[in-house]
């Protein structure tokens, strides 16, 4: 059964408010949601989408499958073995009646999915490239999965703490990512940037708050939520350009697309 538009809108609202907390904590994830919604609306109903994900931390649920309900969607769970030991520690984020729980399709490493070559019109890698040790193998697998003329979509952070250690390997700039996609035989297209220096400060504050003792953290959290975060977001919208140095930007995340030659 294809979920209704209203149900999918509810799922997207749940992702924004509960999982990615775009209005209260991590505004740079707006780019990811905006891009995937756009792709789901643009792709033909008979298109095949392969999403390389980590679903075990959400109890084996694909966050993005409901968006592509009209396409053939394959969720490849690429959670490492360490994820099984950690369990579904983010499952509470999707404990919401708006969530449409679609389980992952298969479990496989990102660099060896076992899927047929040339199966995908679109391959998405949402916020996971930095968790893959075999970078060359990952990009080669993305290229292998794509049909001629197919597109790869990658979302990555630029400002991020070390997390899910030890499975956290590197950070790319959009230019570095474009170079790696080109090495795999893909034609890197345009990229988008999200956030500015003030949302970077906000992100660092969300991390720093976790280092306060619990009693002090509650007080600081209220100050951050009520006063500092709203002010930072206002500044982030108002002051977009570096007025001192040219050729300089301070985004918090980016997305990029790359096409497999026809």
Could you say what each language-model-derived stretch is?
Residues 1-45:
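Class I SAM-dependent methyltransferase Rossmann-like catalytic core
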Residues 160-180, 200:
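Acceptor-substrate binding/catalytic loop of class I
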Residues 124:
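A conserved beta-strand element that flanks and buttresses the S-adenosyl-L-methionine
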Residues 136-148:
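A short glycine-rich, Lys/Arg-flanked "PGG" loop and its adjoining helix->strand segment in the class I
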Residues 150-156:
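Conserved beta-strand signature within the Rossmann-like core of class I S-adenosyl-L-methionine
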Residues 199-262:
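A C-terminal cap/extension of S-adenosyl-L-methionine-dependent methyltransferases
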Residues 48-112:
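Class I SAM-dependent methyltransferase SAM/SAH-binding core
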Residues 186-197:
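Conserved S-adenosyl-L-methionine
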């Amino acid at each position: 059964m294809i979920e209704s538009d209203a149900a999918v809108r509810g799922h997207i609202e749940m992702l924004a408010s509960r999982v990615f907390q775009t209005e209260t904590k991590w505004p740079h994830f707006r780019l990811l949601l905006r891009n995937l919604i756009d792709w789901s609306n643009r792709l033909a109903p008979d298109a095949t989408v392969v999403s390389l994900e980590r679903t075990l931390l959400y109890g084996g649920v694909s966050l993005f499958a409901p968006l592509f309900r009209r396409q053939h969607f394959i969720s490849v769970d690429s959670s490492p073995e360490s994820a099984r030991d950690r369990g579904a520690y983010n499952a509470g984020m999707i404990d919401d009646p708006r969530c449409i729980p679609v389980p992952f399709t298969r479990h496989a490493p990102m660099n060896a999915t076992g899927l047929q070559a040339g199966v995908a019109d679109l391959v998405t890698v949402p916020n996971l490239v930095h968790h893959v040790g075999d970078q060359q193998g990952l990009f080669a697998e993305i290229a292998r999965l794509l049909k001629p003329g197919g597109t790869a979509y990658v979302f990555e952070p630029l400002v991020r703490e070390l997390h899910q250690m030890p499975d956290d390997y590197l950070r790319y700039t959009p230019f570095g990512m474009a170079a790696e996609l080109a090495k795999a035989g893909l034609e890197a297209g345009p990229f988008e940037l999200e956030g500015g220096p003030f949302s970077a400060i906000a992100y660092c504050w969300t991390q720093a708050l976790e280092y306060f003792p619990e009693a002090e953290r509650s007080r600081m959290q209220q100050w951050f939520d009520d006063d500092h975060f709203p002010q930072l977001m206002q500044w982030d919208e108002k002051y977009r350009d570096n007025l001192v140095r040219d050729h300089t930007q301070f985004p918090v995340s980016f997305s990029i697309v790359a096409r497999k030659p026809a």
